[in-house]
Amino acid sequence: QPSISDQQVSALPYSDQIQQPLTNQVMPDIVMLQRRWMDRYEIDSLIGKVEQEWVAIKAFLNQAQIEVRHDTEMKYYIVHLKIVDFGSSCQLGQRIVEVLGIPPAHILDQAPKFFEKLPDGTWSLKKLHNILGVETGGPGGRFKDLILRMLDYDPKIQPYYALQHSFFKQETGIAGHPTYQFSANTGPAHYMTEGHLAMR
């Protein structure tokens, strides 16, 4: 059987599904991982899935415009490849103005989502709450409302209800899914859902 280096072994996933006491018996279909056992073919079957999830993670990072410069070692991922460390991440191009100066007007003119031209001819960067949410049906109110609810100390919005907020929904009124209505008040203590009152 081909030998496996210590470095390769340390990078392999762990499994609690197959555990056997340590013996001197040769077991060609079993790989020892720090007193734990995993079937060799189970490891082989994970290779394609791991690569697929790794590509999906990279695609997500690119879409989110987050550049990960370090801390992408396998020890920062747990099967099924959940990212557990963003310690060295930074926003893409966060120092572009300091390094290259203000972009030329013809470039700013092509990014109306992020910049607006003032009457005096200068450019201004839009507020974050006016930028986020554009793709989901309208910026501004929904994002600002959600943030204010999260910052409201008592009563603070619970994670379950935060996920139901319209900011996270691309479509509303889908059959089979509850429709949550949020009042214009930034600090309400109640939510209306499916015609009944739910306390936070």
UniProtKB/Swiss-Prot annotation:
UniProt-listed Gene3D superfamilies: Transferase(Phosphotransferase) domain 1
Keywords of the record, alphabetical order, are: ATP-binding, Kinase, Nucleotide-binding, Nucleus, Phosphoprotein, Serine/threonine-protein kinase, Transcription, Transcription regulation, Transferase, Tyrosine-protein kinase
The record's GO molecular-function terms, alphabetically, read: ATP binding; protein serine kinase activity; protein serine/threonine kinase activity; protein serine/threonine/tyrosine kinase activity; protein tyrosine kinase activity; RNA polymerase II CTD heptapeptide repeat kinase activity
For this chain, the Swiss-Prot or TrEMBL PTM comment says: Can also autophosphorylate on serine and threonine residues (in vitro). Autophosphorylated on numerous tyrosine residues.
Q: Which domain of life is it from?
A: Eukaryota
In this UniProt entry, the residues modified to Phosphotyrosine are 41, 76
UniProt-listed GO biological process terms: circadian rhythm; protein autophosphorylation; protein phosphorylation
Where in or outside the cell it occurs: the entry states: Nucleus
- Similarity comment text for this entry: Belongs to the protein kinase superfamily. CMGC Ser/Thr protein kinase family. MNB/DYRK subfamily.
What is the UniProt domain comment for this protein?
A: The polyhistidine repeats act as targeting signals to nuclear speckles.
Q: What does this protein do?
A: Dual-specificity kinase which possesses both serine/threonine and tyrosine kinase activities. Plays an important role in double-strand breaks (DSBs) repair following DNA damage. Mechanistically, phosphorylates RNF169 and increases its ability to block accumulation of TP53BP1 at the DSB sites thereby promoting homologous recombination repair (HRR).
Q: What is this protein called?
A: Dual specificity tyrosine-phosphorylation-regulated kinase 1A
Q: Which organism is it from?
A: Oryctolagus cuniculus
